Amino acid sequence: MENKFFEEEKGLSACETVIMKAIWDEEEDISIPDLIEVLRTKWGKDYARTTVTTFLTKLAAKGYVKTYRKGKLSYAHAVKSEEDYKTKLAANDRDFWFGGKLTNLISALCRDRKLTKSEADEIRKILDDSVNN
């Protein structure tokens, strides 16, 4: 099966993913010093400033972020949304690992634990809405 995600999307390394998650979790653009602090305190990543700026340069080349200076500080701004990334990532997993079958993906996700009634009801609503649209 052809996998368009790998052709159209430039995937993220594990380090790039953590950096993007830290950026996406912020409500506004984040300064590089603040990003370094969030990476250290929230994600346990003790990256040097040069390491973070190198990753940001790579992320900018892939179209995920833009960086800019404001006064003496540099800032990172997410260009691609977390929702778009997660949607493409899930579709990639569905196509690559589960033969394009959503039922196989859902089955795998439910295999390690039972759904609560609330979760099952919410999934039913999502499925009903997607069939009717």
Protein language model annotation of sequence segments:
Residues K66-T67, K117:
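Short beta-strand "wing" residues that participate in macromolecule-binding interfaces
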Residues K88-N132:
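Amphipathic alpha-helical dimerization/coiled-coil segments
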Residues G63:
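Glycine-centered, phosphate/nucleic-acid-interacting loop/turn motifs that mediate DNA/RNA or nucleotide
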Residues D29-L39:
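Short acidic, hydrophobic short linear motifs in intrinsically disordered regions
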Residues E37-Y47:
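Short helix-coil junctions and helix-kink-helix linkers
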Residues M1-A22, E26, N133:
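Short alpha-helical segments that sit at the start of domains
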Residues K70-L89:
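Short, cationic-aromatic polyanion-contact patches
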Residues T53-T57:
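Short, hydrophobic-biased segments on the C-terminal half of alpha helices
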